[in-house]
A protein has these predicted regions:
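Pyridoxal 5′-phosphate
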Residues: 1-395
Length: 395
């Protein structure tokens, strides 16, 4: 049995998304900017997809800008707010310590330009509060940008409350909702969200396509110069097949959310209950306000990379919070931000589920993970030191 439990990294494309793309990979190949009939057929598809995405987010179609994915959307949102604030003498930004690198790296570049960034502490409850945001806002704050839900530890932030704080203070609010869209009910107007980023491949759509919701009237800055596509806010011929596939996948996800997500959450809870029985383990992330499919654990005395490789050999595709799999020896910045020490953060495991997973697959994971953890501990000098008292247990 092979179990795919890495849906926070990417999801399998749905049949609905594939079918929606096929006509635009075949005979409807026109450029939507062209005036002839072939181009106009593509434009009709583009307009319909924009309408679909807008309906799912609770906004107007003209407030949707199609992008190449969540990273581009994050960059454009943050840079736009920064440039707008700069013109008014405001160069202070608020974020959290556990954001995606698309946000953190963009903010780091702005810091080099003289912007000041406040990184909110997430150690308490592995989350932030609206009060933390309120306390951090200053007269020169030009943006609050927080994840909607964390890709690694699954914590869902109090977005509506943060949005209300920002609205009252007159500060633009952007949320990276890449992990939330298609999995949680979202209404950007009711939640006072000014900008929101999403990515198609996180909800069974294609890779390489995403969108940025921008509240009508907000001064968006181009980060790609060229033609006048996307109301002049994002140059480049639109990826019609990808956009149509993403819109179809999002509609399907939203239409079946109330049916699918409780079942996914039930599988998540089974995993959390079962893995919590492994000695010297700890759940990462908010235990209550949590994505339906996210399970994140740290196991003391093992290395995450070894855990992943052995799980893969036993048919479980998962991921680790440790960045060692990308060539770095440093543990995840998210795990460090919530207070995990280096040795513990290195022994992390993230299992992320979708509606395509089954109860039988959960049974397999619950059988395999404890076996692999014990196997690795039996070989670990760190674990031996813990058992003999040369080191002190942390978990």
């Amino acid at each position: 049995m092979q179990v795919y439990a890495d849906n926070a990294a990417t999801t399998a494309m749905s049949r609905t998304a594939i079918d929606a793309m096929l006509p635009y990979l075949d005979n409807i190949y026109g450029n939507p900017s062209s005036l002839h009939s072939v181009g106009q057929r593509a434009k009709e598809a583009l307009d319909a997809a924009r309408e679909t995405v807008a309906q799912c987010l609770g906004c107007e179609p003209r407030e949707i800008i199609f992008t190449s994915g969540g990273s581009e959307a994050d960059n454009q949102a943050i840079i736009s707010a920064a440039r707008y604030g700069e013109k008014k003498g405001k160069k202070h930004i608020i974020t959290t310590a556990c954001e995606h690198h698309a946000v953190l790296h963009t903010l780091a570049k702005l810091e080099k330009e003289g912007f000041e960034v406040t990184y909110l502490d997430v150690r308490k409850g592995h989350n932030v509060t609206a009060q933390q945001v309120k306390d951090a806002i200053r007269p020169d704050t030009c943006l609050v940008t927080t994840m909607y839900a964390n890709n690694e530890i699954g914590s869902i932030l109090p977005i509506a409350e943060i949005g209300a704080v920002c609205k009252e203070a007159g500060v633009p609010f952007h949320t990276d909702a890449v992990q939330a869209v298609g999995h949680l009910h979202i209404n950007v107007k009711e939640q006072n969200i000014d900008m929101l980023s999403l990515s198609g491949h996180k909800f069974h759509g294609p890779k390489g396509v995403g969108a940025l919701y921008v509240r009508r009237g907000f001064p968006l800055v181009n980060i790609i110069e060229g033609g006048a596509q996307e109301r002049g806010k994002r140059a480049g011929t639109e990826n019609i097949p990808g956009i149509c596939g993403m819109a179809a996948a999002l509609k399907e996800a939203c239409d079946h959310m109330d049916e699918n997500m409780p079942r996914v959450a039930a599988m998540r809870d089974r995993l959390i209950e079962g893995l919590s029985k492994i000695p010297h383990s700890a759940l990462n992330g908010d235990p209550v306000n949590r994505l339906p499919g996210n399970v994140s654990f740290c196991f003391e005395g093992i290395e995450g990379e070894s855990l992943l490789l052995l799980l893969d050999m036993k048919g479980v595709c998962a991921s680790s919070g440790s960045a060692c799999t990308s060539g770095s020896l440093d543990p995840s910045h998210v795990l460090l931000a919530i207070g995990r020490v280096h040795d513990v953060a290195h022994g992390s495991l993230r299992l992320s589920l979708s509606e395509y997973n089954t109860d039988e697959e959960i049974d397999h994971i619950l059988k395999v993970v404890p076996e692999v953890v014990q196997y690795l501990r039996n070989m670990s000098p760190v674990w031996r030191d813990l058992q003999t008292g040369k080191r002190q247990y942390i978990l």
